[in-house]
């Protein structure tokens, strides 16, 4: 959640953020009213409790003849105290509810607007020029017997697939290359749970308006769409030592997404699916270091795409396209020849202290005082990379030139049937 002090003391900052997101500003006033109601309820309860304490002392020192009347008054006062406590709890619940509904405050650096207002920061690599009509990744995958969508649909339904033979080997090679890069960069590897408790999913900001995008089991547990969720909850209710710098993890997991809002989009191939693999970077840092850490995460993603010899561009995502938890987000988009356009293959988000406040993840400074850490995340490798690899490295006969960095992992220079 956002810092309550910012909401109370400088509400215009939150109003501007809501405006940039294209969302209602009325929730700011609703939350401020709820806050005032809470303060009133607290004051009322504390006043009655003080009266109760005074009356208790009076009863203790009273004459026997006065005690029955004092006890009658005490019973009435006890009922008022009970009601006041309930009103305070109700007011606090309403305040917390509204506070949880407000998305993170958008960075002042994030562009205004929707998708077409995203700012391209840079473009890297040469777009391949083919002397033939480039095939799409599914055609290439089927020719190589590497991707089997039809049997995926038969077994599990639409947007499912099998990776087979070279397809499976290629994904594992990509993941291992990313893992090697992560370990050499000092990240700690985690293999994370893919089922999490509701409070962890809520804490990361994936419920509320995004609840329709995640799978919920009858038990109440949720399937995660990214290991970010599990890693964010890994240190919940803890005080971390970040005096030596950021705490960085790389979490591998299968990921599950309903893609509820994607009807009719990317129905061909494995660009947008319900299950995929991902290696996610996640950092806990001092809030003042979050901007620098975001740049570090993006630099790691760029290294990975450069190793895979994929042309890409980095875009600063417009405010209306940001998720609930993100204050700022960069997308790295790969060139997809069959579509003659750039498509997002990985992203990096600065969530500032938003998730840490919800999950109670703190640090202790040199004076002994605690504060909330900032959390950041970014994908280092995912199944979607296969789309870019197959299409950008295809040859006229349908074989795939293996990027040099993957050759030791695959044991050959070309993938062919």
Swiss-Prot record:
Key words of the record: Aminoacyl-tRNA synthetase, ATP-binding, Cytoplasm, Ligase, Nucleotide-binding, Protein biosynthesis
Record: residues binding L-serine: 226-228, 280, 379
Localization terms from the record: Cytoplasm
GO molecular function terms listed in the Swiss-Prot or TrEMBL record: ATP binding; serine-tRNA ligase activity
Catalysed transformations (reactions): tRNA(Ser) + L-serine + ATP = L-seryl-tRNA(Ser) + AMP + diphosphate + H(+); tRNA(Sec) + L-serine + ATP = L-seryl-tRNA(Sec) + AMP + diphosphate + H(+)
Presence of the UniProt keyword Nucleotide-binding in the record: yes
Gene3D superfamilies, A to Z: Bira Bifunctional Protein, Domain 2, Serine-tRNA synthetase, tRNA binding domain
Any one of the GO BP annotations: selenocysteine biosynthetic process
Main location: cytoplasm
Binding locations of ATP: 257-259, 273, 344-347
One cellular-component annotation, GO: cytoplasm
Similarity field: Belongs to the class-II aminoacyl-tRNA synthetase family. Type-1 seryl-tRNA synthetase subfamily.
Function in brief: Catalyzes the attachment of serine to tRNA(Ser). Is also able to aminoacylate tRNA(Sec) with serine, to form the misacylated tRNA L-seryl-tRNA(Sec), which will be further converted into selenocysteinyl-tRNA(Sec).
Assembly information from the UniProt record: Homodimer. The tRNA molecule binds across the dimer.
Protein name per Swiss-Prot or TrEMBL: Serine--tRNA ligase
Gene: serS
């Amino acid at each position: 959640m956002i810092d309550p002090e910012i909401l109370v003391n400088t509400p215009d900052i939150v109003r501007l953020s809501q405006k940039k997101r294209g969302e209602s500003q009325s929730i700011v006033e609703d939350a401020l009213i709820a806050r005032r109601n809470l303060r009133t309820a607290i004051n009322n309860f504390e006043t009655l409790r003080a009266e109760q304490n005074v009356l208790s002392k009076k009863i203790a020192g009273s004459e026997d003849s006065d005690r029955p009347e004092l006890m009658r008054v005490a019973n009435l006062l006890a009922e008022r105290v009970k009601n006041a406590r309930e009103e305070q709890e109700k007011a606090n619940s309403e305040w917390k509810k509204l506070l949880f509904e407000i998305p993170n405050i958008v960075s002042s650096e994030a562009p205004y607007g929707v998708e077409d207002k995203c700012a391209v920061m840079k473009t890297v690599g040469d777009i391949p020029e083919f002397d033939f009509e480039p095939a799409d990744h599914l055609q290439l995958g089927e020719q190589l017997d590497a991707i089997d969508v039809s049997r995926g649909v038969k077994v599990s339904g639409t947007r499912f697939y099998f990776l087979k033979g070279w397809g499976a080997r290629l994904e594992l090679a990509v993941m291992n290359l990313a893992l090697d890069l992560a370990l050499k960069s000092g990240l700690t590897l985690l293999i994370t749970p893919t089922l999490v408790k509701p409070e962890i999913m809520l804490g990361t900001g994936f419920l509320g308006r995004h609840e329709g995008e995640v799978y919920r089991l009858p038990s109440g547990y949720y399937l995660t769409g990214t290991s970010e969720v599990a890693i964010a909850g890994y240190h919940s209710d803890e005080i971390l030592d970040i005096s030596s710098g950021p705490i960085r993890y790389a979490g591998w997991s299968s990921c599950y997404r309903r893609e509820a809002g994607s009807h009719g989009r990317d129905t061909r191939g494995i660009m947008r699916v319900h299950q995929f693999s991902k290696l996610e970077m996640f950092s806990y840092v001092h809030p003042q270091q979050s901007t620098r850490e975001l740049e570090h995460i993006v630099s790691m993603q760029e290294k990975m795409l450069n190793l895979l010899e994929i042309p890409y561009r980095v875009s600063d995502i417009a405010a209306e396209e940001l998720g609930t938890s993100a204050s700022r987000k960069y997308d790295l988009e790969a060139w997809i020849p069959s579509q003659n356009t750039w498509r997002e293959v990985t992203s990096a988000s600065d969530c500032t202290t938003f998730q840490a406040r919800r999950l109670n993840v703190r640090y202790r400074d040199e004076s002994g005082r605690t504060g909330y850490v900032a959390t950041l995340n970014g994908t280092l490798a995912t199944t979607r990379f296969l789309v870019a690899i197959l299409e950008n490295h295809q040859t006229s006969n349908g074989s795939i030139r293996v990027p040099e960095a993957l050759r030791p992992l695959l044991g050959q220079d070309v993938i062919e049937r």
